[in-house]
Curated annotation (Swiss-Prot):
GO CC annotation, single: nBAF complex
Protein's recorded name: Zinc finger protein neuro-d4
Organism this protein belongs to: Rattus norvegicus
An example Gene Ontology biological process: nervous system development
Top-level taxon of origin: Eukaryota
Zinc finger (C2H2-type) residue numbers: 195-218
Claim: Cell membrane is one of the keywords in the record: no
Tissue-wise expression: Expression restricted to neurons. High levels in hippocampus and cerebral cortex, lower in other localizations in the central nervous system and in peripheral nervous system (dorsal root ganglia).
Function: May have an important role in developing neurons by participating in regulation of cell survival, possibly as a neurospecific transcription factor. Belongs to the neuron-specific chromatin remodeling complex (nBAF complex). During neural development a switch from a stem/progenitor to a postmitotic chromatin remodeling mechanism occurs as neurons exit the cell cycle and become committed to their adult state. The transition from proliferating neural stem/progenitor cells to postmitotic neurons requires a switch in subunit composition of the npBAF and nBAF complexes.
UniProt-annotated binding residues for Zn(2+) 1: 274, 277, 301, 304
Main location: cytoplasm
Gene Ontology molecular function: sequence-specific double-stranded DNA binding; zinc ion binding
Assembly behavior: Component of neuron-specific chromatin remodeling complex (nBAF complex) composed of at least, ARID1A/BAF250A or ARID1B/BAF250B, SMARCD1/BAF60A, SMARCD3/BAF60C, SMARCA2/BRM/BAF190B, SMARCA4/BRG1/BAF190A, SMARCB1/BAF47, SMARCC1/BAF155, SMARCE1/BAF57, SMARCC2/BAF170, DPF1/BAF45B, DPF3/BAF45C, ACTL6B/BAF53B and actin.
Length: 397
């Protein structure tokens, strides 16, 4: 019995247009990927395909050369690989050149003979002995310097410095080499981590890391000591610690929203530097406009925040919030946010839009979502504004 195939128009015009749009976007992305990755592996045949160079432009056309030929296109430059040609015919062997080494030696005086040669050899051995003695004296001086400062040495270097019966000089060289390696590593660490804690001496690469260290180590220790022991630390150390916080202008995470710097009109004054790269803009190397949080004033470059082009343009149209101040755009609360997902159900988590970075509770959406979607997700505002350019349409379903 014959089956009836329904017409596409009977399914609805909106459904048909949506299917065509998905097909168009898929073909566009497929062609873009094929032009970028060469050679690419054909998923149907399993063959690594290369660019065939059959697509030419009008500017490449030339006059026809053969009768009946309308156009000609320039050929690709082809170069044959060089290979080693084995000459089997004895008559085709390369010419043999005999270099007369004795002639220039005779012209320049040649090698000395008799007692003159012996004197030169004795002088060379004497120079070598002098150099060895100088090296030994230098090693002894370095050894004395190391013994004057024994606290700078590690246990392994002290063990290696113990003279052995077979290789006495080798053991000395190991200890000095280890010290040089440690000095080089220390200089590299000083260069890579310029921010130093004035209490424990720990180093960090950036200022936010140093601020985190102060908060979660020394500040917590001081608060506990104030409750348990009133005379635990001297006053000058605590005052220096608090003075460092004043110079740093750092605010704890729990008090950032309430103690952010505000203008006379009540608006939050944004920071003039990026909190991630501290103004270096290391990812792009180009100047970028900062994006500031409307609640705490923290700023960041779009490249440091890993924002797309759509997201960078969208965050300037509303009061953008950083990840620490993020709240639901529908209910306005920040409970059960994504920063503390441990022990929460998927419905209690904040879902972020991939086009505008707005946050939504999954139970605030209409209809509510039971679990986060796979791939990119766009909110209803971005779907209405961007339409087919939204991330949800580009993602394959």
């Amino acid at each position: 019995m014959a089956t009836v195939i329904p017409s596409p128009l009977s399914l609805g015009e909106d459904f048909y247009r949506e299917a065509i749009e998905h097909c168009r976007s898929y073909n566009a992305r497929l062609c873009a990927e094929r032009s970028l990755r060469l050679p690419f592996l054909d998923s149907q045949t399993g063959v690594a395909q290369n660019n065939c160079y059959i697509w030419m432009e009008k500017t490449h056309r030339g006059p026809g050369l053969a009768p009946g030929q309308i156009y000609t296109y320039p050929a690709r430059c082809w170069r044959k690989k060089r290979r080693l040609n084995i000459l089997e015919d004895p008559r085709l062997r390369p010419c043999e050149y005999k270099i007369d080494c004795e002639a220039p030696l005779k012209k320049e005086g040649g090698l000395p003979e008799g007692p003159v040669l012996e004197a030169l050899l004795c002088a060379e051995t004497g120079e070598k002995k002098v150099e060895l003695k100088e090296e030994e004296t230098i090693m002894d001086c370095q050894k004395q310097q190391l013994l004057e400062f024994p606290h700078d040495l590690e246990v392994e270097d002290l063990e290696e410095d113990i003279p052995r019966r077979k290789n006495r000089a080798k053991g000395k060289a190991y200890g000095i080499g280890g010290l040089r390696k440690r000095q080089d590593n220390a200089s590299l660490e000083d260069r890579d981590k310029p921010y130093v804690c004035d209490i424990c001496g720990k180093r960090y690469k950036n200022r936010p890391g140093l601020s985190y260290h102060y908060t979660h180590t020394h500040l917590a220790e001081e608060e506990g000591e104030e409750h348990t022991e009133r005379h635990a630390l001297p006053f000058h150390r605590k005052n220096n610690h608090k003075q460092f916080y004043k110079e740093l202008a750092w605010v704890p995470e729990a008090q950032r929203k309430h103690t952010a710097k505000k203008a006379p009109d009540g608006t939050v004054i944004p920071n003039g530097y990026c909190d991630f790269c501290l103004g270096g803009s290391k990812k792009t190397g180009c100047p970028e406009d900062l994006i500031s949080c409307a609640d705490c004033g923290r700023s960041g470059h779009p490249s440091c925040l890993q924002f797309t082009v759509n997201m960078t343009a969208a965050v300037r149209t509303y009061r953008w919030q950083c990840i620490e101040c993020k709240s639901c755009s529908l209910c306005g609360t920040s409970e059960n946010d994504g920063a503390s997902w441990a022990g929460l159900t998927p419905q209690d988590q904040l879902l972020f839009c991939d086009d505008c970075d707005r946050g939504y509770h999954m139970y605030c959406l209409s209809p509510p979502m039971a679990e986060p979607p796979e791939g990119s997700w766009s909110c209803h505002l971005c779907l209405r504004h961007l339409k087919e350019k939204a991330s949800a349409y580009i993602t394959l379903t």
